[in-house]
């Protein structure tokens, strides 16, 4: 088991910057706004042979009583409960605060291994300027600069040393049991976090009744029927033209990255709002990224029969380019219709990673041509010879022959239908590439 390290501290002391150092990523949003990270955010890191998990948390105020700050405090308490060691981050430049005392008192009561870290300590005389933090009663203050990387390795070594870890065994090579990365995507406030929380049985993501509450792409380990998943809530997308704060712009980028890194994307729509332009744009990006996709309409219980008919018609017309995807009608809050989603998710992943033998593809191609040959274009009639698989996730079929640049889009769709039916490719895009054989005499004739 990888040891778990939780980063705890009041808002804006640099926990997310330190998280990025420890995970060598920019997975956590970093900006100069207090209260930016509001959920537990998991990342992987490695020091020598030792791998570890880091949890980044929202700014912790143990006695927070108002709205979303109370939710952030609860998330942080759960992160501390999950951790093997806690790194309590304070702001060396701002000095000791009453909040720091409150957090220290809370951590001391838990009796869990804890390191006190003074961040933003670059250029400081640690003996003098960090002395006040000894009042917290947590022992030595480790000076670091997360922004510049100073002292971070020494701090990490100290954290891992407290756990007295055995030497790790060599891990087996990657196999087919790797987790399926599932991105839950959609506009703000369509119920993405509510759906994941329902699946997990705990309030893992802050699900607050206001658009844009989840501002980061949060990854959560999860198991279903023996299959490992990584669930990603993708920080509800908004139209780029309406994004004003730097924080929201960064979240849009993280959402697009999460979609691209996923194996399967669950696109969540809001039954009470219909299919919006932004829904169509997100769907288009998923298709462009080549991700397997499942469509789910949330809040289905909140619309009447007429509204449902109009919504189904809207999906057929506005999202016609995703007609290969399974469609589900659910209520995340009432736990209605959630079971069949997993069947479609597994089916979409299986289709996206399907292996298609060259002899079978070639047979299907030649049978299709015999049934309906491609149309002649002027002097040229496309001649198709054989096909092979060119990639997975999404599946790519490469067709070889002559004059294939003249094959129409309509004929490509005809071929796509034949291939989809044979291999049961439900829930995944299918790309067909035409590769025209070069005429060896063409260049000589130009000489």
From Swiss-Prot:
Q: Which domain of life is it from?
A: Bacteria
* The KH-like domain, residue ranges: 353-438
Name the job this protein performs: GTPase that plays an essential role in the late steps of ribosome biogenesis.
Name the residues that bind GTP 2: 186-193, 233-237, 298-301
Family to which the UniProt record says this protein belongs: Belongs to the TRAFAC class TrmE-Era-EngA-EngB-Septin-like GTPase superfamily. EngA (Der) GTPase family.
The gene for this chain is der
What is the name of this protein? GTPase Der
UniProt binding sites for GTP 1: 9-16, 56-60, 119-122
List the source organism: Paracidovorax citrulli (strain AAC00-1) (Acidovorax citrulli)
For this entry, list what GO says about its biological process: ribosome biogenesis
Q: Which UniProt keywords apply?
A: GTP-binding, Nucleotide-binding, Repeat, Ribosome biogenesis
List the HAMAP family: GTPase_Der (MF_00195)
């Amino acid at each position: 088991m990888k040891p778990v390290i939780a980063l705890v501290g009041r808002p804006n002391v640099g926990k997310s910057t330190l998280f990025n150092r420890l995970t060598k990523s920019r997975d956590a949003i970093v900006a100069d706004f207090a209260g930016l990270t509001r959920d537990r955010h998991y990342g992987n890191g490695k020091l020598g042979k030792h791998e570890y998990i880091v949890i980044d948390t929202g700014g912790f105020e143990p006695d927070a009583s108002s709205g979303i700050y109370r939710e952030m405090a609860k998330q942080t308490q759960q992160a501390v409960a999950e951790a093997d060691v806690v790194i309590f981050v304070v702001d060396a430049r701002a000095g000791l605060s009453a909040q720091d005392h409150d957090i220290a008192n809370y951590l001391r009561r838990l009796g869990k291994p804890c390191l006190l870290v003074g961040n933003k300590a670059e250029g400081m005389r640690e003996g003098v300027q960090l002395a006040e933090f000894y009042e917290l009663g947590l022992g030595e203050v480790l000076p670091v600069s997360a922004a510049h990387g100073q002292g971070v390795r020494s701090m990490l070594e100290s954290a891992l040393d407290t756990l007295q870890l055995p030497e790790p065994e060599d891990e087996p090579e990657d196999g087919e049991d790797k987790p399926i990365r599932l991105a839950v995507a959609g506009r703000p406030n369509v119920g993405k976090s509510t759906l994941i929380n329902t699946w997990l049985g705990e309030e893992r993501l802050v699900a607050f009744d206001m658009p844009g509450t989840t501002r980061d792409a949060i990854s959560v380990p999860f198991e279903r029927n023996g299959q490992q998943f990584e669930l990603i809530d993708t920080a509800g997308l908004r139209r780029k033209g309406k994004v004003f704060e730097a924080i929201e712009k960064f979240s849009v980028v993280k959402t697009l990255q999460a979609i691209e890194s996923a194996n399967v994307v669950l696109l969540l729509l809001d039954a009470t709002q219909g299919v919006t332009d932004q829904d169509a744009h997100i769907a288009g990006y998923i298709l462009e990224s080549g991700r397997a996709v499942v469509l789910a309409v949330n809040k289905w219980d909140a619309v009447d029969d007429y509204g449902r008919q109009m919504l189904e018609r809207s999906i057929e017309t506005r999202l016609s380019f995703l007609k290969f995807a399974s469609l589900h009608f659910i209520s995340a809050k009432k736990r209605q219709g959630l079971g069949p989603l997993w069947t479609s998710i597994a089916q979409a992943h299986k289709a996206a990673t399907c292996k298609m033998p060259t002899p079978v593809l070639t047979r299907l191609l030649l049978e299709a041509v015999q049934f309906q040959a491609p149309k002649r274009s002027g002097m040229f009639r496309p001649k198709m010879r054989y096909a092979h698989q060119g990639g997975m996730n999404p599946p790519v079929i490469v067709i070889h022959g002559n004059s294939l640049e003249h094959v129409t889009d309509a004929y490509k769709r005809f071929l796509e239908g034949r291939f989809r039916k044979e291999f049961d490719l439900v829930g995944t895009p299918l790309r067909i590439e035409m590769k025209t054989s070069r005429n060896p005499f063409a260049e000589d004739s130009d000489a």
